Amino acid sequence: MPEGHSVHRLANAFQAQFAGRQVDASSPQGRFAAGAALLDGRVLQAAEAHGKQMFMGFSGDVWLRVHLGLYGMWRFLGSGLEGIGRRSRKPADAADFPPHPGDAVRLRLVSGSHVADLSGPTACEVLSFEEKAMFMIRLGEDPLRRDADPERAYAKLHASRMALGLLLMRQDIVAGIGNNIYRAEVLFRARLEPHRPGRALEADTWHALWTDLAALLADGVRTGRIVTTEPRHRRRQSGPALRDDASYVAHRAGEPCRVCGNAVLAEPMGGRTLYWCACCQTT
C-alpha cells in the first residue's frame, strides 16, 4: 500500500501537468461510468493529497477522491510524468494516441498529450465540495500538509493507553503512515519502545518525532524513495543509499542492528509486521 509520500508525488504530478486543462474522462472498465461522465469536459483546477487520500478538484466544485489501497495504481503517459506512477506503453503510430487502455482501467483522464489511467483502487468517487470537506474532517494530521496540527495529533495519542506502534498506524491520528516502514523507522530513530502507551509519551518527544517524520516524508516526495538511514550507518557513506542500506530495522528481521549490532526483532502488531531493536529502543 502506498505511503503518504507516494500520494503527494502523484498529486504534485497532476497539479503540474493537468491543472488548468480541460480533461476528457472515461471508464473503460465501466464500473465508474457515471462518475467519469460527471468529470468529462471539466477543467482540473487542483490536486492535493491528505495522507493516503488524493483529492482532485474540477470546475463546478466537483471533486474526485481516490484511495489506491493495496492494489490500486496510476499509469501515466506524457512528458513531465517520468518517475511518477507507472508508464503506459506509448503507441508507435501517433494516430493510435491515446493507446488502448485495457479492460482493467477504472478511470482514464486525457488532456492533450497527457494520459492518466487508474486501475484497482480501493475507493474512487465523485464528491461535492461539502462532502469532500466532511470527509477530510475524519482524517488525521498529515505532516506534509501546511495545515497540519501536531498538537491535535498529540492530544489523541496522549489520551490513549494503546501502544505507540498501533497509534501511529491510525489514519485518524497521523495520516500517511500505513505500512511497516515509516512506523518502524521513525520509532527507531526516536529510540522509542513501540509498546509504550501513547499516554506516556512526553510532548517534547512527540514534537521531535513529528519533525523527523515530516523531514523523512518530504525526502520521499523529492526522491521517490524511502530512505531513513544516516550516511554514517551505511556501507557506502557517499552517494545515494543502496537499497539494502535504506532502512534501520524495517524488513531486516534477524539481521544485526546498524547501531548496536543486536538482532532486529519482528512481531505482529496491528495486522502488520513490526520491526524494532530491543537494545536501542528503550525509551
Question: Residue spans of the language-model regions?
Answer:
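Structured catalytic/nucleic-acid-binding cores of DNA maintenance enzymes
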Residues: 1-283
